């Protein structure tokens, strides 16, 4: 395959975080594992948080995370940047600063030229440079499909770790990127997306969550997570269950990327979206909401935005300052005392 003809999304079965194992399969796989017994482990796997946090000293803790994805975009350099932005996001979501990273590349050497991998790695380096994160090495595996990601280590003060399990009743919920990257990536793969839709999806997926995270830290958030493979509904369920609360989402307020509604109507919905819906639908109260309108809320996001829980006064100030600094931010819900189900959509 020559480099000029490459459309990376067509070389893989599923694009971006839509290729992740579904929540039901993952839950089954993890069911027999025990929590690591180490008093210095601040955050482990039990709350499905964005990363693990390990205390080194009274003032320094490490945030550890790893993300690997298939291409959600056709251009190799764009794919590399998106994959790195996706991996860095977990550190930002937990209130940390990315420190070091290692490349993880799975490459079909029989079907793609080495220059393609070079472009992918260059795109990843672009994002790391912007984040001020030092690349220290990596690992490659020859594989049937192209996959790329990074393991990232960040630092945070042990008493300032942000979790997905500490939302409080009365909090407002803010989202810092629109939804739809999984749907639009599927449309790109199926050659159904317009040039404008593809460009918008790539731009949002390429955007680091750094600016939103740095602003967030000024307003003492109750909780935070990033929206990735399990969609807005899935990650809201994780936050609600971990926090012992119910999250209410305002369907009309949830922002979507350009063309998402049309692509859903045309059937450009990734299998991962349906897996998420199958697993989480019984865990939410969606009332009489139109099922088709709900689909983007289950859409697996690649390098999605932050879901931030802030007290109302802080949320208003955050929104105002975000607008002044051209940081995307939309109020999409609030946090209620625990009801029968973890998530309500109205």
Curated annotation (Swiss-Prot):
GO MF terms listed in the record are:
ATP binding; magnesium ion binding; selenide, water dikinase activity
Which cofactors, by name? Answer: Mg(2+)
Where is ATP bound in this sequence?
20, 47-49, 67, 90, 138-140
One of the protein's GO biological processes: selenocysteine biosynthetic process
Domain of life the protein comes from: Bacteria
Q: What is its EC number?
A: 2.7.9.3
List, alphabetically, the InterPro entries matched.
PurM-like_C_dom, PurM-like_C_sf, PurM-like_N, PurM-like_N_sf, SelD_I, SPS/SelD
UniProt binding sites for Mg(2+): 50, 90, 226
SUPFAM superfamilies referenced in this protein's UniProt entry, alphabetically: PurM C-terminal domain-like, PurM N-terminal domain-like
The answer to whether keyword Transferase applies is: yes
**How is the cofactor bound here?**
Binds 1 Mg(2+) ion per monomer.
Going by the record, the broad EC class of this enzyme is transferase
Q: Work out whether the entry's keyword set contains Ligase.
A: no
Could you tell me the keywords of this UniProt record? ATP-binding, Kinase, Magnesium, Metal-binding, Nucleotide-binding, Selenium, Selenocysteine, Transferase
Could you state one GO cellular component term attached to this entry?
Answer: cytoplasm
Any idea which residues are catalytic in this one? 17
Q: Where is this site: Important for catalytic activity?
A: 20
Q: Which Pfam families match?
A: AIRS, AIRS_C
Q: Which reaction does it catalyse?
A: hydrogenselenide + ATP + H2O = selenophosphate + AMP + phosphate + 2 H(+)
User: How does this protein assemble?
Assistant: Homodimer.
Q: Which NCBIfam families match?
A: PRK00943.1, selD
Role description: Synthesizes selenophosphate from selenide and ATP.
- Protein family (similarity comment): Belongs to the selenophosphate synthase 1 family. Class I subfamily.
- For this entry, the protein name equals Selenide, water dikinase
- Taxonomic classification, please? Bacteria, Pseudomonadati, Thermodesulfobacteriota, Desulfuromonadia, Geobacterales
Corresponding gene?
selD
């Amino acid at each position: 395959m020559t480099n000029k003809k490459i459309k990376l999304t067509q070389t893989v079965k599923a694009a971006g975080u839509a290729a992740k194992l579904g929540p039901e399969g993952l839950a089954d796989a993890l069911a027999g594992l025990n929590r690591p017994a180490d008093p210095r482990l601040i955050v482990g796997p039990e709350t499905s948080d964005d990363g693990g946090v390990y205390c080194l000293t009274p003032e320094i803790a490490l945030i550890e995370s790893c993300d690997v994805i298939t291409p959600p975009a056709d251009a190799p350099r764009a794919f590399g940047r998106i994959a790195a932005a996706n991996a860095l996001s977990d550190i930002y979501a937990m209130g940390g600063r990315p420190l070091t990273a290692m490349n993880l590349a799975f490459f079909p050497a029989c079907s793609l030229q080495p220059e393609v991998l070079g472009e992918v790695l260059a795109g990843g380096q672009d994002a790391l440079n912007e984040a001020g994160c030092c690349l220290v090495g990596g690992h490659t595996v020859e594989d049937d499909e192209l996959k790329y990601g990074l393991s990232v280590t960040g630092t945070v003060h042990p008493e300032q770790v942000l979790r997905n399990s500490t939302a409080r009743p009365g909090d407002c919920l803010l989202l810092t990127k629109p939804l739809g990257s999984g749907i639009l990536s599927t449309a790109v793969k199926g050659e159904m997306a317009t040039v404008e839709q593809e460009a918008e999806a790539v731009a949002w997926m390429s955007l680091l969550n750094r600016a939103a995270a740095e602003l967030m830290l000024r307003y003492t958030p109750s909780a935070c997570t990033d929206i990735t493979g399990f969609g807005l509904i899935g990650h809201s369920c994780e936050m609600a269950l971990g926090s012992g609360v119910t999250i209410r989402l305002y369907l009309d307020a949830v922002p979507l990327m350009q063309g998402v509604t049309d692509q859903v109507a045309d059937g450009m919905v990734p299998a991962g979206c349906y897996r998420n819906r199958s697993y989480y639908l019984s865990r939410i109260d969606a009332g009489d909401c139109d099922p088709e309108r709900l689909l983007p809320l289950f859409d697996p996001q690649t390098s999605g935005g932050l879901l931030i829980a802030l007290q109302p006064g802080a949320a208003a100030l955050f929104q105002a300052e975000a607008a002044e600094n051209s940081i995307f931010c939309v109020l999409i819900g609030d946090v209620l005392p625990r009801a029968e189900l973890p998530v309500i959509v109205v």
